[in-house]
């Protein structure tokens, strides 16, 4: 029984130290850079400026956060 207790103690001590990331290893959330990487619907190759929607057969308009989007974009 003592061998099982020693093994359990070792596992409980080693697992959290190696499995959980440290604060320095976590990446920083940069929402401004994410916004620059997003392509606007006007620049999307499938966007039809005249219809303000994507090509034929697209179910338009859909709205997300007060912005009109297409189902294909």
Swiss-Prot record:
Gene Ontology CC terms, in alphabetical order: extracellular region
Signal peptide: 1-19
Transmembrane segments: none
Cellular localisation: Secreted
Tissue specificity note: Expressed by the venom duct.
UniProt key word Kinase: no
GO molecular-function term, one example from the UniProt record: ion channel inhibitor activity
Keywords on record: Cleavage on pair of basic residues, Disulfide bond, Neurotoxin, Secreted, Signal, Toxin
Described function: Shows a paralytic effect in fish.
Miscellaneous field: Found in injectable (milked) (IV) venom.
Free-text domain note: The cysteine framework is III (CC-C-C-CC). Classified in the M-1 branch, since 1 residue stands between the fourth and the fifth cysteine residues.
Family: Belongs to the conotoxin M superfamily.
Protein name: Conotoxin CnIIIF
Species this protein is from: Conus consors (Singed cone)
Lineage start: Eukaryota, Metazoa, Spiralia, Lophotrochozoa, Mollusca
């Amino acid at each position: 029984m003592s061998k099982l207790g020693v093994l359990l103690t070792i596992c409980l001590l080693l697992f959290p130290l190696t499995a959980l990331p440290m604060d320095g290893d976590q990446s920083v959330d940069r929402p401004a850079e994410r916004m620059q990487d997003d392509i606007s619907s006007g620049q999307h190759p499938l966007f039809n400026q005249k219809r303000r929607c994507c090509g034929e057969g697209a179910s338009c308009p859909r709205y997300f956060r007060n912005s009109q989007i297409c189902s294909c974009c």
